[in-house]
């Protein structure tokens, strides 16, 4: 069977898996590590071609995280929000997503994905948003996420919040700090880390359509 579930589990499937795995394999020609140097070849291939879509998604995410990327950032890059024609998204976030879109194509489902590094636990829907994922937060600090309501019997008087995941939106819990991190707050923080807009305007060229 698959040796995965090191960083993710998911409900659904990754329909773009062939393109995702092929492009990751193509990138290996230009990959290098200043720390591992020649030993870096032992890391390759990034993706186990014999694995399932779950295993391949896990391979890619683990590779980014083990390379030094923060887990939520790696998830945002691999499973982005629908941003290109989003009229309510801030320009900073659009610039962020456009910047990373040149480096990583979306891993599209339909899939609901749960991820963790032991301290952070999160969930995200792919940008198509076709897998149901609902969650409750209770007054005694439980968070219950499932594909349907009624999976567990919960006293309705204890529920302080009920909501559902939306396409590309992230539910993230910091178990060390004991708090839920707001999606907008998290992503604006990442979007503020670099002047992505400047990089995009400097490196991207829009060709005329006529």
Per-segment meaning from a language model:
Residues 3-4, 206-209:
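Short, small-residue-biased leader/transition segments that mark boundaries at the very start
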Residues 16, 204-207:
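A detector of low-complexity, intrinsically disordered, Ser/Thr/Gly/Pro/Ala-rich segments
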Residues 23-37:
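A short, polar/charged loop-to-alpha-helix boundary motif
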Residues 37, 41-82, 159-205:
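Intein/HINT protein-splicing elements and their conserved insertion hotspots or analogous self-processing inserts
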């Amino acid at each position: 069977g698959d040796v995965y579930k090191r960083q993710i589990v998911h409900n659904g499937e990754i329909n773009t898996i062939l393109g995702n795995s092929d492009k990751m394999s193509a990138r290996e020609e230009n990959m290098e590590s200043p720390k591992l140097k020649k030993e870096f070849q032992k890391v390759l291939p990034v993706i186990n071609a014999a694995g399932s879509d779950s295993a391949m998604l896990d391979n890619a995410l683990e590779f980014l995280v083990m390379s030094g990327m923060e887990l939520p950032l790696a998830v945002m890059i691999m499973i982005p929000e629908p941003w290109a024609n989003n009229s309510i998204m801030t320009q900073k976030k659009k610039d962020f997503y456009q910047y990373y879109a040149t480096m990583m194509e979306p891993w599209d489902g339909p899939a609901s994905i749960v991820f963790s590094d032991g301290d952070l636990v999160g969930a995200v829907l792919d940008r198509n948003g076709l897998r149901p994922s609902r969650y409750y937060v209770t007054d005694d600090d439980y968070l219950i996420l499932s594909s349907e309501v009624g999976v567990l019997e919960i006293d309705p008087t204890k529920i302080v919040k009920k909501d559902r995941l939306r396409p590309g939106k992230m539910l993230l819990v910091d178990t060390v700090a004991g708090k839920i991190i707001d999606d907008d707050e998290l992503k604006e923080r990442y979007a503020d880390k670099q002047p992505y807009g400047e990089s995009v305007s400097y490196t991207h060229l829009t060709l005329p359509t006529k």
